[in-house]
Structure formats: C-alpha cells, structure tokens
Swiss-Prot record:
Belongs to the peroxidase family. Ascorbate peroxidase subfamily. The gene is APX2. It comes from Oryza sativa subsp. japonica. Its cofactor is heme b. GO terms for cellular component: chloroplast. Binds 1 heme b (iron(II)-protoporphyrin IX) group. Residues 113-137 are annotated as: Disordered. Optimum pH is 6-7. This is L-ascorbate peroxidase 2, cytosolic. It is found in: Cytoplasm. Inhibited by p-chloromercuriphenylsulfonic acid (CMPSA).
Length: 251
C-alpha cells in the first residue's frame, strides 16, 4: 500500500463528522444495528478493484441499484435508518458517512478504535455486481477477492473475517441462518475461539469461515487471534482502516 495523502477538510466539515459520530452512537444503541452498519461500510468499500481503480467506499450504496445486488440484501434497511441523520448533515459525503458508521459500530460494541480520515467524495456510478466475497467459497476465492481485486493481505483477510463476531446470517438475505458467536452484539475475539474449538450446536460456520482453518497460511493467524485478543484488535483496526480507504487519498 502506498502512503496516504489525506485531503484537507473545513472546520465546518470536521464539526459535522463529530456530530454524525454522536448521532450514530445513539442510533446504533437504540436500534441494536451495529452489525448492519458494519456490513454497510464493508460492502461499500469491498467493491474496490485495484486494476481498474473503480468501486470502493464512495457512497454509491445510496443507489437502489447497488442495494439490489444479491450480496447486499438487507442493506436498504441500513440506508433507510441512516437517512434521517444524513439529512441533518448535508455537508457530509455519503462516502464518509457510511464509513464512519462502520467505525462507530465497532467502537460502541467494545471493539478497537479504527482511525477515521474524512474527505471521501461521492461517486455517481455504482460498481458492477459480483465483486464481493461469496460465503460458499474457500480460500482461493477469498484471496481472489481480497488480495487480487482489493489489494489486501492474508493477515487482513483473517482479521476482517473476525468482524463476523458481530451479527448473524439471515436466511432471506444470504441463504444462511444463525450467529457466529453466542453474543452477536459484542465485538471480541470469540469468532476465532469458536472456530478453533470446532462446530457447536446453534452457532454458524460458513464455508468461507472453515476455509480459514483449512488453509496453512490462514490457520496460524486464526489460532493467534483466538489466543490473543489484543493482537486481533490491533490487526483488525489496521485492516478495517485499509478497507475503508481503498482508492481514497492515495499518493
């Protein structure tokens, strides 16, 4: 990854970011929607394609066309929940706002503090469908999407997978049902402790989760994060930051 050169934003813009943060904390507490907000931020950013420099965290998820992509089922709910806050803060880009929602979602559920740099500009065109990871696939597919397409590392893949500590799968959205951990509203390393301890009645393991244990490069990272939550939090914050800034502020 090249070094970053962040744009300068006005004091008024920074004040709007602060206000958005407070309002997002309130919304997420009231609606228990941290998992949904993290998914919105991830799915917005995870469309980035290194070779064509298209897609990425640039606010296109507000477009109903992108919300209708199969991988984004249910994200129309996130957009709708966020609209009343966004309406109060017209100066903010959707791009910054959706990524800020993901950062706040991790913070308020007890996860690490992910740095946030404002200044993303909204792009008009949504990316083509089919760039997000498919949960039914294995490690080759994960590397194709995260490494070849997005430019992230093996460590980023495993750390970001740990974000599944939040939330659950819904049959009507993904075809899968259930939560990964026994407390889906707390951000901790239990995704990894569950993976290492094997399958349990009532908890979900997707094919893409099992792939982490089967892969010789991924598995040591899973075991490290299961044993050391601080190491997971440090690597997660770095990976989330990278994901949230794909295609943004690059030299």
């Amino acid at each position: 990854m090249g070094s970053k050169s962040y744009p300068t934003v006005s004091d008024e813009y920074l004040a709007a970011v602060g206000k958005a943060k407070r309002k997002l904390r309130g919304l997420i507490a009231e609606k228990n929607c941290a998992p949904l907000m993290l998914r919105l931020a991830w799915h917005s950013a995870g469309t980035f394609d290194v070779s064509s420099r298209t897609g990425g965290p640039f606010g296109t998820m507000k477009n109903p066309g992108e919300q209708s992509h199969a991988a984004n089922a249910g994200l129309d709910i996130a957009v709708r929940l966020l609209d009343p806050i966004k309406d109060q803060l017209p100066i903010l880009s959707y791009a910054d706002f959706y990524q800020l929602a993901g950062v706040v979602a991790v913070e308020v559920t007890g996860g690490p503090e992910v740095p946030f740099h404002p200044g993303r500009q909204d792009k008009p065109e949504p990316p083509p469908e089919g760039r997000l990871p498919d949960a039914t696939q294995g490690s080759d597919h994960l590397r194709q999407v995260f490494s070849a397409q997005m430019g992230l590392s093996d460590k980023d893949i495993v750390a970001l997978s740990g974000g599944h500590t939040l939330g659950r799968c819904h049959k009507e959205r993904s075809g899968f049902e259930g939560a990964w951990t026994s407390n889906p509203l707390i951000f901790d390393n239990s995704y990894f402790t569950e993976l290492v301890s094997g399958e349990k009645e009532g908890l979900l393991q997707l094919p893409s989760d099992k792939a982490l244990m089967a892969d010789p490069a991924f598995r040591p990272l899973v075991e490290k994060y299961a044993a050391d939550e601080d190491a997971f939090f440090a690597d997660y914050a770095e990976a989330h930051l990278k994901l949230s800034e794909l295609g943004f502020a690059e030299e």
